[in-house]
From Swiss-Prot:
Annotated domain remarks: The N-terminal half of the protein contains two conserved domains I and II. Domain I includes a slightly degenerated ERF-associated amphiphilic repression (EAR) motif which seems to be involved in the activity of transcriptional repression. Domain II is required for the correct degradation of the protein through the SCF-mediated ubiquitin-proteasome pathway. Interactions between Aux/IAA proteins and auxin response factors (ARFs) occur through their C-terminal dimerization domains III and IV.
Main location, first listed in the record: nucleus
UniProt name for this protein: Auxin-responsive protein IAA26
Keywords, comma-separated and alphabetical: Auxin signaling pathway, Nucleus, Repressor, Transcription, Transcription regulation
The gene coding this protein: IAA26
Motif, EAR-like (transcriptional repression): chain positions: 38-42
Length: 269
């Protein structure tokens, strides 16, 4: 019976040896704090709290920056996929190298339709100038091009006159007009070659150039080298085949002509 009270005294003493939970936790925390203080560090002692707060602040800043970049990238992604100007806009590649700007030719730039308009207008002007035409506007406002014949100049000489002249056959339509022009060209020159002392220095009309009844007769040389009287063939045939003209004395016709003497022989008879 005496053993029971002894056991009762030993039990509470063993329980007192186990520290209470709160005191043990506080003591453990104090021990860890003391161990941290005793640790060897590169920084000065007592700067742990400041370093911890700085790291915490830096971490919060990094989180905020990441959040902002994610929000911006999300908005950009939505804008690129849902904006109506997605097809027209193009983002240049970062790896592309900028080339040096070359010399600017033809500034300011001309649009394509203006270039086409200029080319068509220049081609029209070129065609009209090549035809030698004259542009006239009708009552309806339409342009009409009147074709102008190019000048067909033929050299003409006269016996007794050292100076030759040129006539444009396309400016005349008949042999009569041609004979009138020849008389006008050589009348003064022929009078200048005559002897003034004999009283023959006055200008006299040159008649009978086509029918051989005058002092002089008009002849021509064709492309084949034949010498013939002017007026033997139709006017258009004469214009297309004549090479040069010459006014000769009527007395020398038989020896000067190489073809077409039948008309002169008829006139002589």
């Amino acid at each position: 019976m005496e053993g029971c009270p002894r056991n009762r005294e030993i039990g509470p003493k063993l329980l007192d040896l186990i520290p209470q939970g709160r005191k043990w936790y506080q003591e453990d925390k104090n021990n860890t704090d003391q161990e941290k203080k005793l640790e060897l560090r590169l920084g000065p002692p007592g700067g742990d709290e400041e370093d911890h707060s700085a790291i915490k602040k830096k971490n919060t800043e990094i989180r905020n920056i990441k959040k902002e970049t994610e929000d911006k990238s999300f908005h950009c992604f939505n804008g690129n996929h849902f904006s109506p100007s997605n097809k027209t806009t193009s983002v240049p590649h970062i790896s592309q190298k900028r080339t040096a700007p070359g010399p600017v030719v033809g500034w300011p730039p001309v649009r394509s339709f203006r270039k086409n308009l200029a080319s068509t207008s220049s081609s029209k002007l070129g065609n009209e100038s090549s035809h030698g035409g004259q542009i006239n506007k009708s009552d309806d406002g339409e342009k009409q091009v009147e074709t102008k014949k190019e000048g067909m100049f033929v050299k003409i000489n006269m016996d007794g006159v050292p100076i030759g002249r040129k006539v444009d056959l396309n400016a005349y339509n008949s042999y009569e007009q041609l004979s009138f022009v020849v008389d006008k060209l050589f009348r003064g020159l022929l009078a200048a070659q005559r002897d003034i002392s004999d009283g023959q220095g006055e200008e006299k009309p040159i008649i009978g150039l086509l029918d051989g009844k005058g002092e002089f007769t008009l002849t021509y040389e064709d492309n084949e080298g034949d010498k013939m009287l002017v007026g033997d063939v139709p006017w258009q045939m004469f214009v297309s085949s004549v090479k040069r003209l010459r006014v000769i004395k009527s007395s020398e016709i038989s020896s000067a002509l190489t073809f077409g003497c039948s008309k002169q022989e008829k006139m002589m008879h």
